[in-house]
Amino acid sequence: MAERRRRLGDWGEAVAVAYLAQHGYQVVAQKWRCAAGEIDIVAQRDGVLAFVEVRTRRGVDPGMAAGSITGAKRARLMMLACLFLAAHDLPADTPWRIDVVAIAVASQGRVAIDHILAAVEET
């Protein structure tokens, strides 16, 4: 079961990369890792870095995938974004946000994608 879930997640990330590229984003990094965790995708468009969390679920509603991000996950994503900026010596005033690309795969194979800009904000 874990292998099937990992394959679905990897597939979802590939779909998200293609989607972002089609919408004018340049992918800067994929699966960026540090001791604190992983950022699925880092992309840039119009001078703004987007740290993208990809959520892929079976079902018909991409909102279900987006809604699966807990408060702890939101806090971790904020921390990881700051660590990425520091690791790449980017200026403190670099514009950035955390997006979610939610992907729902219906049983008939139809795919629904919802790109939520600035889905995670500081609280």
Curated annotation (Swiss-Prot):
Gene3D superfamilies: 3.40.1350.10. This is UPF0102 protein RoseRS_1723. It comes from Roseiflexus sp. (strain RS-1). It comes from the Bacteria. It holds the Pfam family UPF0102. Belongs to the UPF0102 family. One of its GO terms (molecular function) is nucleic acid binding.
